[in-house]
Each structure stands twice: as structure tokens, then as C-alpha cells.
A protein has these predicted regions:
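Active-site-proximal helix/loop segments of hydrolytic enzymes
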Residues: 1-160
Length: 160
């Protein structure tokens, strides 16, 4: 924890609607201040419908459209991903000057704090799935998120 609190937004085994996830996030923003809360929605991507192996591979991170604090958080995560996945594809989109992909995903658009969504490789890519199921792959995913967050916090505290 390194002195910071974290909370699993969806501890239930059931699928929780996005509106409830946003409500929970924004309740934390109200309780602690939106600049003291970040949201990282962690996913595994898919390129197909699950009926066959696909060729898409790689790690990526999404923010909502426009330049926000979320873009800086995403850039910190990208830097950690490049370090932790040296032999894996890192999917980037520099069309707006930074590496993250921008989409109007509900959870990113409606959360009041810095919010990103990571896609940690592809579950329907044989090579990505093997990597995700390996001890090294799991640790690299954890390290990427932890190091990206810590870098964002370090930079955030140096700009205060």
C-alpha cells in the first residue's frame, strides 16, 4: 500500500452496472476530494466473439476525450508498461499528443476524478493469454499498475 489507501470498487462476484460503479467512485470523490481519488478500471481485451483465436495483441490505456488529469495518469501507466512489458506490444495513439486512446466510455466520462481504463492484453490471443496466465505476466500487470500510480503520485506531489 506504500501509505496510500486503495479499494476494490466491485468486490461482488456479480456484474455491477456502470452507473453503480460511477456512483461509488463519485461518492469517494465527495468524501475525500476529487483530486485525492483516482479510478483505474482494469480489463482484458478481446478482438473476436470467443469462437476462435485472434491475432490482436498488446496492452493499452484509455481516457475520455479531451486533455484532463486522466491523460497524465495514463502516460505514467504507459511508462510503466513499456518498462514491465519489454517484449510485448504496447498499443498507442498519439493523435492528440499523448499515448492513450480516447473514447467516451461511460465510467471515464462520468467519474469526477482522474479515470483510466487499462486493457491488459487480449484473452482471445493465444500468446497474450499464455502470458496473462503465467506468474511473470501476472506480476508484470500488477507492477505496471502499481508503478504507474506511484509515478503519478510522485509527479502530483511535486507540482503541488
Amino acid at each position: 500500500s506504500r501509505g496510500y489507501d486503495s479499494e476494490l470498487l466491485v468486490p461482488e462476484d456479480d456484474d455491477i452496472p456502470l452507473s453503480e460503479r460511477v456512483r461509488r467512485t463519485n461518492a469517494h470523490c465527495q468524501a475525500f476530494g476529487k483530486t485525492n481519488v483516482i479510478l483505474i478500471s482494469i480489463h482484458v481485451n478481446a478482438a473476436g466473439d470467443g469462437s476462435k483465436w485472434m491475432n490482436a495483441t498488446g496492452w493499452s490505456c484509455y481516457t475520455c476525450k479531451g486533455q484532463t488529469e486522466s491523460d497524465r495518469l495514463a502516460t505514467c501507466l504507459y511508462e510503466a508498461a513499456i518498462k514491465n512489458f519489454p517484449d510485448r506490444r504496447i498499443r498507442k495513439d498519439y493523435s492528440d499528443g499523448d499515448p492513450d486512446w480516447e473514447e467516451n466510455f461511460y465510467i471515464l466520462r462520468k467519474s469526477h476524478c482522474a479515470a483510466v481504463l487499462t486493457e491488459n492484453f487480449f484473452m482471445d490471443s493465444h500468446s497474450d493469454l499464455e502470458y496473462l496466465q503465467s506468474k511473470d505476466g501476472k506480476q508484470a500487470v500488477v507492477d505496471t499498475h502499481a508503478e504507474g500510480i506511484m509515478e503519478w503520485l510522485r509527479v502530483e506531489s511535486s507540482t503541488d
